[in-house]
Amino acid sequence: MDGVSSLPNELLCHILSFLTTKEAALTSILSKRWRNLIAFVPNLYIDDTVFLHPEEGKRDRPEIIQSFMDFVDRILALQGNYPIKKCSLKCLTEVDSVRVDAWISNVLARGVTDLDLLIILDCESDDNYRLSPKCLQSSTLVSLKIDGGIDIARVDNFDILLLALPALEELALVDVIWKDEDDYPLVNMKNLFDARIIFMLQLPGAREPDDDHWFDQNVALRYSNVWKLFLGLQNVPNLYLSPDTLKVLSLYCESMPVFKNLKSLAIKSGKERGWQAIPVLLRNCPHLETLVIEGVLHNVTDKCGDACDCISREDKGRSLTSCPVKMLEIRGFRGTMKEMTMMKHFLDYFLCLKAMNIYVEENDPTELRFPEVSKCIMQMMEEYNKLSSCNVELLVTDYFYFSEKWTAKGRIL
């Protein structure tokens, strides 16, 4: 008997839970001992791209698709009412939507806590999978991801959907079809732990002008009710905002809610987007502890606000001085003097700051590849640490001139 087969069933099922459901099912041919273990695997990874033959055209044959659906039916029937923790369902072929409904209902009835759906019935048409509200009624579901053009237009009230999921903490909606794409739901997502808000806007030119008129009337109208979405997120402890999301927020700063429970805020900046929304955002986070900024370089406008050092103003840094943030992470650092000026600005005006971690850009070349620049940056960091009680650290990887972690106090960690 080999060492693996001598393991207890519970441990074998745990090992199988890391495989795709097809791979786990194939182990049944090893011996009688393995034949029914698939019935007790707590995780399901059902992916028709893994099950179906990858050869061109073969996967679209009706008999192949039918065999995939029959396989899923057999697995679910074999498992019966055995509890399930996680289910990932990926269907990119013309499977029967009625059977998809049944599969989703099956795992929900068995107490699934993590559900990931990617369903595209027909890639060449607008025939989207229509998610029935009856398929999303669960007292155990904690994490839900809906992806791939799934139509939730039949869900008349989004708040009703969330009320049917009282334990939900993580919700991701990617490329879904809404009943009214110009409106946003006003719901209280009080259990939500982590929110990532990513809007995608189309600029009329390469860069935005210095005023807000670059939005045409139709686009502005589309986001006129966005405040309702953020009002429902005001209790979230962790929030991530994309560059376009910051731009949308800048149009409706007066409606921005107070995020009274927010502890960690992550912002991705962009050279084509300004920082108009950041001052109000920081003032509306009274208990913020960690701030992450990915890319401090941004588009400078006359309404950039007092959060940056781009334009001289009397109220410079006012929103920073009132912010209680203790940890600041800067990501995507390129080693430019403009970035270093921003670091000094943060050190001067974030009065509660205890630590600043600066992560060097890893995907593109930076100025740090030049020895004279890296030496200058180290000297400036050294000076910053002398002038501030905040501990400034530069974290880099795969750079010849730096160790894995260097502190401005001159220590190699």
From Swiss-Prot:
Note the PROSITE patterns from the entry.
Answer: FBOX
Q: Which residues form the F-box domain?
A: 1-48
Q: So which domain of life are we looking at? A: Eukaryota
> Cross-referenced InterPro entries, in alphabetical order?
F-box-like_dom_sf (IPR036047), F-box_AtFBL13-like (IPR053781), F-box_dom (IPR001810), FBD (IPR006566), FBL60-like (IPR055294), LRR_dom_sf (IPR032675)
User: TM spans, by residue?
Assistant: none
Provide an example Pfam family for this protein.
F-box
Q: Which PANTHER family match?
A: RNI-LIKE SUPERFAMILY PROTEIN
What name does this protein carry? Putative F-box protein At3g58820
